[in-house]
Amino acid sequence: DRGYMVIKDAQGNLYLSAHQHSWQYTLGADGKSITATCVNTTNCPNIDGGSVTIKAPEENTLIYDGSNKKAILENKLLTGEKDPTISYTVGNGQGATLPDGSYPTNVGAYTASITVGGVTASVTYEIQKADPAAKNFVFTAPGSLTYDGMAKTADIKTATNITGMGDVMVKYYQGETEVQPMNAGEYKVKISVAYGSNFNAASDLTDENWAFRITPIITEPTVELSGNTTYTYTGERITPDVTVTIDGR
């Protein structure tokens, strides 16, 4: 890396002098920044080579949501160096290194590092567990909602971008009473969630759309005469024997 400056000799002549920078990289006191300084001070037009700082994501974003939590770089070196590549390790710098193209996503501590001129700066941060929310789930109502004497169960699965959810228990309510979703009527669905690797536990989680209605069966009864089917008029009331069935029952 070269710099240039105008030099005036003893005779008053001016000429342009090229300067070869010799950059020294120094780690900041907080361990998060690297500063470049030219140590070849002879005829150096500017010894300041700038600095670069690695910074953790904003604290309010460090809650699991299925997205990457990348560290960022602030400021730039003026030495002609490319922006350093950020690498990530699990834990406080002693754990496994994440593969290229992978970033902190799941709950846990991570260390993000950059290296320039043999000097490494780093920052450690931690992703916290999230509280389960209805948006983390996909609700599907039962396929058949006509009464048939069988329980009607909804399907609730975690969203495709979500991992580390605890076991889910699905419950059905009419008003405030937990019931089996079998008879005709309106049902509200609630879930309880156990602790998971990325989520806290939750109870009675629901959404206004987590509901369905079982409709009563509508069918014509079948009426058949049974026993004696031949009668002689007597002027008296005659009551035949009949059998009434619905759907063969």
Predicted region positions:
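Solvent-exposed beta-strand/loop surfaces, strongest in extracytoplasmic domains of secreted
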Residues: 1-249
